[in-house]
From Swiss-Prot:
Compartments in which it is found: Cytoplasm
Similarity field: Belongs to the RbfA family.
Annotated source species: Ruegeria pomeroyi (strain ATCC 700808 / DSM 15171 / DSS-3)
Disulfide bonds listed in the record: none
Major subcellular location class: cytoplasm
Protein name per UniProt: Ribosome-binding factor A
Cited NCBIfam families: PRK00521.2-5
GO cellular component assignments: cytosol
Domain of life the protein comes from: Bacteria
Single biological process term from Gene Ontology: maturation of SSU-rRNA
Functional note: One of several proteins that assist in the late maturation steps of the functional core of the 30S ribosomal subunit. Associates with free 30S ribosomal subunits (but not with 30S subunits that are part of 70S ribosomes or polysomes). Required for efficient processing of 16S rRNA. May interact with the 5'-terminal helix region of 16S rRNA.
InterPro entries: KH_dom-like_a/b (IPR015946), RbfA (IPR000238), RbfA_dom_sf (IPR023799), Ribosome-bd_factorA_CS (IPR020053)
Gene3D superfamilies: 3.30.300.20
GO MF annotation: an example: ribosomal small subunit binding
Length: 131
């Protein structure tokens, strides 16, 4: 197999990033407009923080969080229940030969950010930073 001369690092390729961003934007628009035929899902405001795609673009993992943080378990279940309809809507926008299979995970970025802030507020860490 030929080596990819444009990407040799451990991170995602430009194509993965571009496709992930298009999926994120499309998913956000669909959820904001309430295009999904599920009243439970349409009642919730959902933030799509990031979408990561596999190197072969067959799987897309969307990191989601309900606005306000309430109902986190329900969000993943509702999105998974409606992933066929969401995948069809994304496929129309993407224009790829194959539409990636959607997987949903809770976005824990804000939790990690709070932990980092708390760590920097500790006296021992503050002393180390001042030195």
């Amino acid at each position: 197999m030929a080596k990819n001369k444009f990407h040799d690092g451990p991170g995602p390729s430009q194509r993965q990033l571009r496709v992930g961003e298009v999926i994120r934007r499309t998913l956000s628009e669909v959820l904001a407009r309430g295009d999904v035929h599920d009243p439970d899902l349409n009642r919730m405001s959902i933030t799509v923080g990031e979408v990561r795609t596999s190197p072969d673009l067959k799987i897309a993992t969307a990191y989601v969080l309900p606005l306000g943080g309430r109902g986190q378990e329900d969000v993943v279940q509702l999105l998974s229940r409606n992933k066929g309809e969401l995948r069809r809507m994304i496929g129309k926008k993407l224009g790829l030969k194959f539409t990636p299979d959607l997987r949903f995970r809770l976005d824990e970025t804000f939790d990690r950010l709070d932990d980092t802030r708390r760590m920097f507020d500790q006296d021992a860490v503050r002393r180390d930073l001042d030195e």
